[in-house]
């Protein structure tokens, strides 16, 4: 059997791929303190959940440090959308659902190649809850993604099959939103996919 890939090297490779895709589409990066949103701007807060914080089931290094940054800039936005990874138990993207497979290996699902993850962000668990202390007083909508048991979902706009849409693009356009700021976890996956799909949907996009 092929040895499982080293997690650090694997994530570095994916991060480099996401960075290249971001550079190719010229998505600007903004420091939180320099943001000046207007009434046609929206903030998308991506997956700031316990599962991605230190001690969670799929932790991102310093994943708890995004909370004060987001809290500091949130009051400037009249329009905030929140996403949550919200998997069913036994989700197809979990390594535990595939005999002989380990986390960070890959398999082929109906829509193509899929990275297999540790069980994480299972619906209704504390692991899937938003991180304590996150304060978003003007949040208007929560997009829960990954609840389709057979399809993974990174982006707030489209599932990983690249066919199933969440309706977020229409929601934003109906409210006259032109510019989308994206912040949260993790930059190399759900933040990157959300930002790239926002650009594809016709919005001006900045990653925080």
Question: Which residues does each PLM region occupy?
Answer:
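Histidine-anchored nucleotide/phosphate-binding helix
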Residues: 192-199
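Active-site alpha/beta core segments
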Residues: 68-179
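Hydrophobic "anchor" residues on beta-strands that sit immediately upstream
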Residues: 42-43, 81, 206
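Active-site metal-binding loops of divalent metal-dependent hydrolases
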Residues: 48, 85-86, 185-187
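N-terminal secretory signal peptides and thylakoid transit peptides that target proteins
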Residues: 1-18
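A short glycine-rich beta-strand->turn/loop micro-motif centered on a GG-aromatic cluster
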Residues: 181-184, 204-208
């Amino acid at each position: 059997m092929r040895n499982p890939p080293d997690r650090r090297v694997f994530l570095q490779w994916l991060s480099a791929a996401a960075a290249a895709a971001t550079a190719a589409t010229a998505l600007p990066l903004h420091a939180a303190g320099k943001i000046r949103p207007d009434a046609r701007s929206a903030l998308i807060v991506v997956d700031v959940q316990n599962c991605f914080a230190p001690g969670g089931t799929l932790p991102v290094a310093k994943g708890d440090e995004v909370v004060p940054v987001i809290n500091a800039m949130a009051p400037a936005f009249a329009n905030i959308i929140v996403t949550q990874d919200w998997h069913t138990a036994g989700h197809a993207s979990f390594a535990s659902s595939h005999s002989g497979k380990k986390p960070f290996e890959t398999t082929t699902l109906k829509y193509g190649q899929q990275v297999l993850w540790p069980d994480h962000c299972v619906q209704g668990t504390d692991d899937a809850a938003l991180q304590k202390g996150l304060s978003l007083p003007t949040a208007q909508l929560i997009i829960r993604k990954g609840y389709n048991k057979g399809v993974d979902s990174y982006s707030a706009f489209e599932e990983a099959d690249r066919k199933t849409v969440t309706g977020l693009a229409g929601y934003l356009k109906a409210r006259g939103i032109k510019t989308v700021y994206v912040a949260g976890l993790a930059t190399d996956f759900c933040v990157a996919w959300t930002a790239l799909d926002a650009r594809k949907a016709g919005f001006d996009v900045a990653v925080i």
